[in-house]
């Protein structure tokens, strides 16, 4: 009578995940007993690798909002359903006791904007709320389930808007934005109420949803955001052995010491973090740049004070399939446009235009940001940290960065850049984080 659902971003985020192309996490999901999965960073591997992993996955991999391009289908690229064009199975029906529950999959809609399309050139993504409504109506008419649940990687705000515009969904169980939401959030729409849930990330919580289904309807439910205190849970011997076996061929490299730290190295804030600052500082130092830009990723584990930084630790912040670095001259006006564009992806008033992630991390500059302002007006007072000079719109600056989504950059992978920096530093202390001046967000618990 129980289903175990995985909200995505599971096959990526460590050295072994990168080196095995996600296979290590597929094996872990199988051991955990996952029933249904959706994706986002799963699609940062090549399409053939994604499909190979799905074949090895015991769980069903669902996505109602990924389609095979028409010209790709004409060239022989396979689809789950050639009539609809769905690349993957869009939904499934599960029988739990006497109840029949429909689960619809929703992948991250902006995957090919936020991540390289070159890895998955034959698939299109989108929110596809009209397709969602058509699918919900079809399931109701043809399958007549007792409950309809969407397993989503939209992000919390986008899920709330989808709950407003799509009717007939009972619950949306969401991922992507890493929000640990303590209660099921009710959203009214024209046919009733849809509850939106989000369970944080990285195994910190589980969403536990108990449904009381009687006579073909949900009579009542109980929602629990269950914290996971890993140190209090006895380790599973089978899982422990699996992890040890996965890591064994790489153990010497993973445990290789690089430097030490007297500060907590973390990636947690919407605008910055000490790990991100190290990456930004490394880009400036190793690349000889004035300014650095690093993506606003949310994944990665922390390193505690007085701990040795190992290569494994570094890879939890950088292990990805497009890690290449760059250094090039960029005009001040373009730097502002980059900051404005990322800010609009995050703070656009329309949740369907929010592409998720956190604000791009910066090194060598500080700035003021008003998230509630209009695009083009959010970023002001950009200043060079070293000299205190204001950024000149007409002047070119040497900018270093990594993780380009379009064309592949030609530089070394970012972990090599950061390792060089850390080895030179030997010991990390008194990190000065380039924190923007954030205005207009007092009392907003979602911005830190």
What are the language-model segments listed below?
Residues 222-235, 384-388, 404:
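Short, solvent-exposed aromatic-acidic interface loops
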Residues 43-48, 124, 155, 232-237, ...:
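General structural signal for secondary-structure boundaries
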Residues 117-121, 261-269, 316-325:
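Glycine- and acidic
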Residues 58-61, 65, 69-72, 77-91, ...:
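Feature captures C-terminal
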Residues 1-230, 270-282, 292, 346, ...:
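Acidic, metal/ion-coordinating pockets
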Residues 100, 264-265, 390:
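Short, solvent-exposed loop/turn motifs
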Residues 24, 45, 89, 127-130, ...:
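Generic recognition of stable, solvent-exposed alpha-helical segments in well-folded globular domains
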Residues 227-310:
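Hard-cation-handling environments
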């Amino acid at each position: 009578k129980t289903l175990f659902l995985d909200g995505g971003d599971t096959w990526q985020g460590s050295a072994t995940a990168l080196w095995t192309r996600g296979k290590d996490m597929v094996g872990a999901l199988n051991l955990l007993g996952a029933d249904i999965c959706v994706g986002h960073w799963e699609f940062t591997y090549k399409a053939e690798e994604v499909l190979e992993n799905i074949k090895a996955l015991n769980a069903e991999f669902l996505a109602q909002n990924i389609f095979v391009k028409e010209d790709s289908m004409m060239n022989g690229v396979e689809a789950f359903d050639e009539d609809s064009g769905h690349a993957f199975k869009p939904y499934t029906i599960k029988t739990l006791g006497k109840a029949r529950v429909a689960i619809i999959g929703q992948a991250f809609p902006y995957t090919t904007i936020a991540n390289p399309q070159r890895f998955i050139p034959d698939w299109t993504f989108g929110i596809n709320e009209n397709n969602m409504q058509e699918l919900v109506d079809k399931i109701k008419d043809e399958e007549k389930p007792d409950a309809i649940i969407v397993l989503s990687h939209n992000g919390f705000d986008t899920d709330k808007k989808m709950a407003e515009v799509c009717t007939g969904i009972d619950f949306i169980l969401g991922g992507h934005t890493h929000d640990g939401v303590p209660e099921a959030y009710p959203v009214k729409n024209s046919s009733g109420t849809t509850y939106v849930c989000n369970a944080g990330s990285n195994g910190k919580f589980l969403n536990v949803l108990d449904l009381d289904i009687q006579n073909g309807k949900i009579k009542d439910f109980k929602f629990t955001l269950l914290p996971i205190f890993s140190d209090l849970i006895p380790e599973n011997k089978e899982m422990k052995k699996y992890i040890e076996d996965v890591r064994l061929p790489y153990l010497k490299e993973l445990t290789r010491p690089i430097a030490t730290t007297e500060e907590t190295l973390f990636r947690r804030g919407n605008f910055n973090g000490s790990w991100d600052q190290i990456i930004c500082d490394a880009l400036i130092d190793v690349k000889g740049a004035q300014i650095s830009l690093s993506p606003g990723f949310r994944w990665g584990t922390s390193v505690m004070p007085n701990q040795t930084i190992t290569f494994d630790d570094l890879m939890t912040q950088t292990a990805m399939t497009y890690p290449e670095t760059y250094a090039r001259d960029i005009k001040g006006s373009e730097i502002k446009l980059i900051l404005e564009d990322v800010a609009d992806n995050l703070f656009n008033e329309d949740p369907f235009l929010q592409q998720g992630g956190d604000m791009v991390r910066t090194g060598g500059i500080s700035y003021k940001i008003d998230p509630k302002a209009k695009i083009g007006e959010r970023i002001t007072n950009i200043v060079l940290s070293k000299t205190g000079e204001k950024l000149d719109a007409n002047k070119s600056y040497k900018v270093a960065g990594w993780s380009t989504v379009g064309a592949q950059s030609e530089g070394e992978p970012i972990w090599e850049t950061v390792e060089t920096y850390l080895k030179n530093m030997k010991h990390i202390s008194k990190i000065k984080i380039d924190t923007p001046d954030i205005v207009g967000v007092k009392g907003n618990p979602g911005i830190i």
